[in-house]
Every structure is written in structure tokens, then in C-alpha cells.
Amino acid sequence: IVGSDDVFDAALRRAGAVRVRSFVALFSAAKCLASRYRPVGKRLAIVTNGGGPGVLAADWVNEILLNLGKLSPETVRALAPQLPPLASLSDLIDLSEDAGAEHFRLAIEAASKDRQVDGVLAIYSPKVGSDSCGVATALAEVKKHMSKPLLACWMGDASVVPARAILREASIPSFRTPEAAVGAFGNIASFYQNQQLLQQTPPPLSTLAKPDIEGARLVIESVLAERRKVLTEMESKTLLAAFHIPVTKTILARNAHEAMMIATQMGFPVALKIDSPDISHKSDVGGVVLNIHSGTAARDAYTDMVQRVARLQPQARINGVTVQNMASARRGREICIGLVTDDPFGPVITFGAGGTMIELIDDRAMELPPLNQFLARRLIERSRVAETLGEWRGASAVDRDALEQVLLRVSEMVCALPQLREMDINPLIVDEQGAVAVDARIAIDQAANTSGGRADNFSHLAILPYPARYEQLWPMRGGGEYLVRPIHPDDAQMLQQLVQNLSPESRYFRFISSMVELPASMLARFTLIDYDREMALVAVFRERTVGADGEIKETDRIVGVSRYVTNPDQSSCEFALVVADDFNGKGLGSRLMLSIMDVARDKGLAEIDGLVLANNPGMLKLMRSLGFVVKPFPEDADFKLVTHTL
């Protein structure tokens, strides 16, 4: 069901990139993104003087999963009297054939100010006697005061060439067809969504109830010791339960009499399922019987099932039949949560519709682990089955929080158990009361030993979890305490404030530049790190201030940063350090350096080095006190090379 190209899409999306599939789309995307529009949502309002092109554009909006931006009732009431009599504002903003430049200006201006609209597409169809240049000039004027994307589609050829020149001069992306214009806005919307994914901090293992990781590892080790790679249903559910994923109670019966006794003790109704390492799809061979209401029926179902499976798949090894309580899907939805392992991206979590027809439904959204709540929610939203999770055909809306928790727990499993190769929780039945895994199949293999002696065991992941183990509280010289922790993507504003508040000399010592603040690209590079090839630790101090109303407010402030980037030799790293001027002499510099050295050592690096300006005596003194070797830098006499063996 899942192809490598799907995984590549998921990786690009998580990296904040926009993928295009043709040269035409490539140039359309470049034209839009080069206009430096600030990425927004995906609600596109269409303003047109031709109904046909407008409808084509609206159809393509639905086709590529955008939303048609509709004007609010307040905007409609204010705008309608100013438009031609035949204008329609119900879905499209169809100005009719009588529309002129002023009508376009009024409609676009109103749409751009409407909170239900994220971008505006103006489609112009040339009419006899119409002024295409006048309309283009109106767009150019409106664009000066717009903060939302404005795109244009000027239909026609020679007669609208001068108008297109006006649009180009105003930096308004212009397209020849409605579909191309809508697709270009789709690129902006995708860029916005993917940039949100890029800024998500890879979460640590769940801070909720601690999973029984050791118990799960014992199950895996016992299976591998038996030279098996596919877990039984009971073993699979044991793994899920170890990570607090709700499962139906399941007991293995090895003969018909045991099946009858177990079913009677569990209470009816029950379900019986064949237990065989050689059968992946039990229903295909008649290996599932549901809604059994008596002990006699359970005994007979066991006998019939074993005989039926032996006839249809005689080579299959049969361990027995599992007996489990029925989990009714009458008002619940059947979901499939899975895991596939890709080369080279590693484990990938999948989500979609479950049941016996998943291959035909072909509903699979996917995301690279680890997940946080935002990523789990977005994963659900990208699936087609998401439309059925609200109130649907008389059924109540499902417990979304419970569904998201299962995804977070699966992510936790994937991070903690590198032996996992494949997993299908199908079906996971979810309703308004929660979620429960009814069936599960897990395949494993020996974990590759690629950690290089590192303390973590996440080398199987394309994206490392947030390393919460490096968070530590430290006392500050002179009183108080501060938190040293790995940097977050949302630390950008605090990091910028740290740099802005540095003295010119301190900024020059750190950046060898007279900059007064970090450029946006550098700020992103400093905060969006992978926690693998590079690491940044920040010292966070909680300041207490008295507001104008007399209330005491607590605000966090970054007062120091240490970081390293792994060198190309993969055995050493280069560091950088900065401390707020008003926190010098309080022990922050030495603590941040010792902490970043501990991280580098933990990662298996052998040496840490850096360049220090020769006229920075304070930094050189700190380096010597920490045991660094200070020597001239042969390529530039203005610097000293400082090194320390880890």
C-alpha cells in the first residue's frame, strides 16, 4: 500500500519543502515564491468577470484539496451595493461581464480584508470594449496595501500583453490559465503548512505514563531467540499494552474445549481468530468468527475454523485460536495505524481507514517519527477517513484525543524499539468513548548496531527525538538558578533578543561581524537543528518583573548559548559560545562549555575545537581554565585555535 515515493513526499513535507511534479508547476511555484508572499492558509477567494473560468478555478481548488474562500455575510452586505446588478457573491465573487476596473478593485480589497480568506485570485476574461490595462492597474494599486497573496490570471493572448507587463512590474504573479494560478497558490499553502512541520520540535518520549520498555524488549528478544521475525497476535498486543495502547483481552486456546471455557469466563459475545505465523490476512482463509454468544458455539467455531484453514492453506502452522472480547464497530470507526521501514528514511508511521478492504480503499497518510500532538493531528487530517471522525451517519464524533494518544504511543514504540520493521494495528476501533486495538501484526528484525557507543539508541530514525535527558537545573553564582537545555525552534525570538542586547564588542567577538541582530536565515539555522550532527544548549533564566498594574510577572530569557557542529571527519566538532553581558562572571560560560562537551562526548566525538579572536582575553582565559590547548591559527594570525580532547 505504501510506496517509496510516498515516503519521499513525507520526508520533503517534514523538511518544509514543496514538491512539484512538472516543469510548468516548477516555474509556477518559483514565480509565486519569488514574490515573497508571507505564507498563509489555504482558503482562496476567486474574483472573476467570467463565470466559466471562475468555475474551472473553483473545481481545481477542490481537486488539489484547497478551500474556496467565501466572503463573510458582513463583507457581502457591504460590497454587494457597489457591484454591477448581475454580480454574484455566494461562492465565487463573479462580478459579471459588466465589471470594470473599479469593481475589481473594490472586490479584491474587500476579499483581502475578510478573515475567511487567505489569498485572492483575480481572473480577467477580455470582453469587447473592456480595459484590461485599467483592471491590471487597479490590481497593482490594491496590491500595495495587501498583506495576503494576490495572484492574477489574464485570459487571452496579444490583447492582454500590456496588462501582463503592468502585473509583472507590480510583482503580481500572472498566469494564462485558471488551473495554473490555483496550483501556484496551492504551492504557497503547502509551503506554509510544511514550514509549520519544519518548526515542530521532535518530542521526547512521552511525559505521560511511563511505558514498560524493558518488558517490551524481553518479548522481542524471546521471539528473536526462537529465530522468528513475526510476532503472534498475543505477542503483538503485549507490545502495544506495554506502551499503554488499549487492546482487547486476548487468550490463546489450543483446543476446542479450551476455547469453550475461555469464552465462557470472558463473557459473551466473543470473537475467535486463527493464530498462525504463516497467515497475515486471517479473513482471507476464514480465520475470523465474530459475535459468538455461547460456549457451544465457541467450541464448534474452533473446530470448523481449524478444519477450514487447514483445507485452504495446508502448509500453514497453526498454534491454536485466540479468544477475545468483541469490540463493536457498529458506531465506531475502523482505523489502521501502521509502520513501514524505508531505505533510506527508516521507520514511517501510516494512518488511514482500516478493515478488511484497506488495499482497495488505499487510504494512507504518513509521517516520519517522532510525532508530537500537532504532527499527530495533521497526520489524521491528511487521511480520507478523517471526514468520518466527526458526527457521521447518526454516530457521535470520535474521541480525537484518544486517537492522537495512540499515534503518540506508536511513535514512542518506534523510537524506543529499533527492532520494529512492520506493524499493522488493524482494526483500531475508535468511538466517542476511546480507542481499542482489536488486531495487530508486528514484524521485527535484529537492530543494526550503528550507535557507535553513543548513549542513545535512535540511529534508526531519520529525525532524532528531542534530547530531554540533557535538561539540567544549575545554581547561579550569586544566587538563583538557571535551566540548561537543548534549543527549541520556538526559541528564535529569545535568541534574537539575546543578540540584540549584546554589546557591540560581544557581538563582534561571537560573530566576527558588526551585525546588530541575526538575519532570518541565520536565526532559522541556529534554532532548527537536527540534534544529531549539531547541538545547541541554551541557559534559560526566569526573570521576575513587576508590571504597571503591580502584578509580578515571570518571563523566560535566554542568557547564554553553547553549540557545536560536527566536522566532516565525523570524529571532531567545532564549538561556539556566547553569554549575555549582564550575566558574565556568574559561571554560565564554564557550565555551558562543560555541558556541550558532555553532549559531544556522549555522541562519540573525540575532539572539540574552536577559533577565538586573539584580542579576546576573557574567552582565552576561560578556555585555558577548562583545559583547552591554545595555539596560533596558521591561516590567520588574528585567531587562536583552541582544542580539547574528549
Mark where each language-model region is.
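Peripheral docking tails and interdomain loops at the edges
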Residues: 1-48, 52, 58-69, 136-231, ...
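Short glycine-cluster motifs
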Residues: 13, 40-126, 134
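ATP-dependent carboxylate activation and anion-phosphoryl transfer catalytic cores
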Residues: 2-10, 19, 133, 138, ...
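Active-site nucleotide/adenylate-binding loops and adjacent lid/helix of ATP-dependent enzymes
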Residues: 24, 30-40, 208-333, 341-345, ...
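Long, contiguous binding/interaction regions
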Residues: 446-646
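Gly-rich Lys/Arg/Thr-decorated short loops/hinges at beta-loop-alpha junctions or inter-strand turns
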Residues: 1-15, 82-94, 116, 121, ...
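Long hydrophobic segments that form regular secondary structure
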Residues: 100-142, 241-244, 254-268
